[in-house]
Amino acid sequence: MFDIGFSELLLVFIIGLVVLGPQRLPVAVKTVAGWIRALRSLATTVQNELTQELKLQEFQDSLKKVEKASLTSLTPELKASMDELRQAAESMKRSYVANDPEKASDEAHTIHNPVVKDNETAHEGVTPAAAQTQASSPEQKPETTPEPVVKPAADAEPKTAAPSPSSSDKP
């Protein structure tokens, strides 16, 4: 894989022994071996997934070819019934779109006035006197119901705080 010969591997081992020492070298070798093992398993997993995806794609392509071939070799009666089913499905779609309650509620909440892009067009036909009349017209206040007034009870006496004992009360 890396095209490393025995002499190069021996040189790396000796350098590692000098740098890490005899106590830490086995731990470092185990760690590096674990990394290499993890990378190999990852590469194998990716390769297997790609192979499965390619097989699945080939299967789907062949299935589409078979479907096209079977549609062209259908009897005229089956073709006629398929056309009738398609027409029925299209008419159902059209009737659903026409009677869509969600669309009707959306239409009810839609503002149909076009957006005015030009400021002069928006104020066309409005004179200062008309604007003053609109501005000075009384506002309509919403009707309010009178709220009931709560009266305090006559027999209820206001509570007073009890006097706290002071230092002069003590003997």
Swiss-Prot record:
Residues 100-123 have a biased composition (Basic and acidic residues). PANTHER family: SEC-INDEPENDENT PROTEIN TRANSLOCASE PROTEIN TATA, CHLOROPLASTIC (PTHR33162:SF1). This is Sec-independent protein translocase protein TatB. It is a single-pass membrane protein. Its main location: membrane. One of its GO terms (cellular component) is TAT protein transport complex. GO terms for biological process: protein transport by the Tat complex. The keyword Cell membrane applies. The chain crosses the membrane at residues 1-21. InterPro entries: TatB (IPR018448). It is found in: Cell inner membrane. It comes from Escherichia coli O1:K1 / APEC. Residues 130-139 have a biased composition (Polar residues). One of its GO terms (molecular function) is protein transmembrane transporter activity. The Tat system comprises two distinct complexes: a TatABC complex, containing multiple copies of TatA, TatB and TatC subunits, and a separate TatA complex, containing only TatA subunits. Substrates initially bind to the TatABC complex, which probably triggers association of the separate TatA complex to form the active translocon. Part of the twin-arginine translocation (Tat) system that transports large folded proteins containing a characteristic twin-arginine motif in their signal peptide across membranes. Together with TatC, TatB is part of a receptor directly interacting with Tat signal peptides. TatB may form an oligomeric binding site that transiently accommodates folded Tat precursor proteins before their translocation. Residues 89-171 are annotated as: Disordered. It comes from the Bacteria. Keywords: Cell inner membrane, Cell membrane, Membrane, Protein transport, Translocation, Transmembrane, Transmembrane helix, Transport. Belongs to the TatB family.
